[in-house]
């Protein structure tokens, strides 16, 4: 045994000179291959097609008929007044340092990497040196908007390689103001459960007082814009509220919805002097009394000549007279809003507000109202107690951009009446005033529903883009509002205006 060990030891010793003469293998030459993307700010982590929840979600059954009344924390991905902030945590959108950018070195070859971020000749940030591994090859930095040079340095042994990337950090700040057609009324997050199961229903809203939902068209447009490019991100400030008017909503408090300040003030409190890129606004329907029209038409035949049964039109001798008076006031009301978009303005109570800061080239996108009056074959609806003549009148004198003056209305009995149309239509006033103010209306919201050969109104069955009567009791607020498909179309048309197909 001893002899065998000695022989083995001698053999190993004799091999040592040979091993020492082998060359040391050089480290592989480094390759610098980097990329960058903006971290999405309008997130859809569960890929359901809608921006994720606000500051809190039901502890269970969020999308069921009866969600839990206990809320738990979740990521804040929509900035809204009256957010449900679990634990009082502030939202990410208040970060004054800027917006998150993800830098990736995963396609590089080497041992370690570092990013150097500069503007002109000034280095603004250098990341810690990290190893190139699957778990460590990405790093996130927070940067203000602007133009940058991202320099990736990859090291391998004593060698290094460098790659320079030019980048523009851009976050679109989008603000959504307005009424129920913008807030997503009728479309709580758990609407699918109600549509498929019916029965007792507790709607889960992002904001209970305003019946605001991420299923609303402006929120869907924000997500479309977010997903259109990895080199930009989108921050949505969502303040639209069901029931809003110019003075009770946009320029003043809306106590019935729990809003103690105007939407302009609410947005200002959230973003301060940060510049807005896109602002959508849906307003006018409640100002002119559209709900009063629907209620009266449901209860009275020949409703344009009937006395309105609810405010605000009950203050006038008949529905038609009240509508024309109210539509005639709308351009001046919209003009009072305009100064708030870019400078100081006067609120509804006469007090002064610094208004909202608008970036150079910002877009103000007024939203006309869609056509809810036609059947799938294009003819006027006859729905519940509202007959075709009154649906035709409502379409022609409220929703179409232009109308004959006078308007020939044929009541159920007697001769045709020539109804004065000196103030035009609701949508006509929106389009005309938008042109005067330099706003860019989302024409497609009207044309997709109103100019198409197929009707998408409340009686259009599977082609309907609007709810009919959603219930006698309980969940009634969605009646005569855009349904799931209708809000999808609104989101699509808003996105088109900002260049997203």
Give each language-model segment a name.
Residues 193-325:
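Conserved SGNH/GDSL esterase-like catalytic core that processes O-acyl groups on lipids
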Residues 172-184:
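Short, hydrophobic/glycine-enriched beta-strand segments
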Residues 182-188, 246-249, 290, 374-375:
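Short, solvent-exposed loop/turn elements at domain surfaces
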Residues 464-501:
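Histidine-centered active-site loop/cap adjacent to the catalytic His
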Residues 29-173:
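Beta-strand-enriched, solvent-exposed domains that form extended recognition/catalytic surfaces
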Residues 1-28:
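Secretory targeting and sorting signals
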Residues 264-477:
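Alpha-helical cap/lid subdomain in secreted, periplasmic
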Residues 174, 236-238, 441-443:
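Conserved beta-strand scaffold positions in the cores of enzyme catalytic domains, especially
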């Amino acid at each position: 045994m001893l002899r065998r060990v000695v022989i083995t030891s001698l053999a190993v010793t004799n091999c040592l000179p040979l091993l020492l003469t082998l060359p040391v293998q050089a480290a592989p030459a480094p390759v610098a291959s980097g990329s960058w993307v903006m971290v999405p700010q309008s997130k859809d982590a569960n890929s359901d097609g809608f921006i994720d929840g606000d500051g809190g979600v039901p502890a269970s059954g969020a999308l069921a008929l009866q969600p839990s009344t206990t809320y738990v924390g979740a990521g804040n991905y929509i900035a809204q007044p009256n957010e449900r902030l679990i634990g009082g945590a502030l939202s990410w959108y208040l970060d004054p340092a800027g917006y998150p950018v993800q830098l990736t070195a995963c396609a590089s070859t080497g041992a370690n990497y570092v990013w150097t971020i500069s503007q002109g000749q000034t280095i603004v940030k250098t990341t810690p040196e990290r190893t190139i591994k699957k778990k460590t090859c990405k790093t996130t930095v927070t940067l203000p908007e602007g133009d940058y040079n991202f320099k990736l340095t990859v090291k391998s042994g004593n060698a290094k390689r460098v790659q320079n990337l030019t980048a523009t950090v851009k976050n679109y700040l989008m603000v959504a103001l307005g009424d129920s057609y913008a807030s997503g009324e009728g479309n709580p997050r758990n609407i699918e459960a109600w549509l498929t199961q019916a029965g007792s229903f507790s709607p889960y809203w992002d904001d209970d007082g305003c019946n605001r939902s991420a299923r609303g068209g402006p929120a869907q447009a924000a997500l479309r814009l977010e997903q259109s490019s990895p080199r930009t991100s989108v921050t949505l400030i969502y303040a639209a509220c069901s029931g809003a008017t110019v003075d009770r909503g946009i320029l003043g408090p809306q106590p019935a919805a729990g809003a103690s300040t105007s939407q302009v003030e609410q947005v200002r409190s959230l973003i301060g002097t940060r510049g807005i890129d896109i602002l959508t606004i849906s307003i006018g329907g409640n100002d002119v009394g559209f709900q009063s029209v629907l209620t009266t038409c449901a209860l009275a035949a020949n409703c344009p000549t009937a006395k309105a049964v609810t405010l605000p039109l009950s203050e006038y001798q008949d529905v038609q007279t009240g509508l024309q008076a109210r539509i005639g006031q709308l351009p001046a009301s919209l003009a009072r809003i305009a100064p708030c978009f870019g400078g100081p303005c006067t609120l509804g109570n006469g007090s002064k507000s610094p208004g909202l800061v608008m970036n150079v080239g910002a877009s103000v996108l007024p939203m006309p109202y869609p056509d809810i009056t036609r059947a799938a074959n294009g003819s006027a609806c006859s729905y519940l107690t509202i007959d075709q003549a009154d649906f035709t009148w409502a379409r022609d004198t409220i929703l179409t951009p232009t109308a004959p003056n006078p308007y020939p209305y044929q009541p159920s009995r007697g001769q045709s009446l020539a109804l004065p149309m000196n103030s035009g239509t609701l949508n006509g006033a929106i389009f005309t005033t938008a042109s005067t103010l330099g706003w860019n209306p989302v024409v497609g919201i009207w044309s997709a529903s109103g100019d198409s050969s197929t009707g998408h109104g409340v009686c259009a069955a599977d082609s309907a883009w609007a709810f009919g009567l959603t219930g006698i009791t309980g969940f009634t607020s969605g009646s005569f509002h855009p349904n799931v498909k209708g809000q999808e179309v609104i989101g699509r048309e808003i996105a088109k205006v900002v260049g997203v197909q």
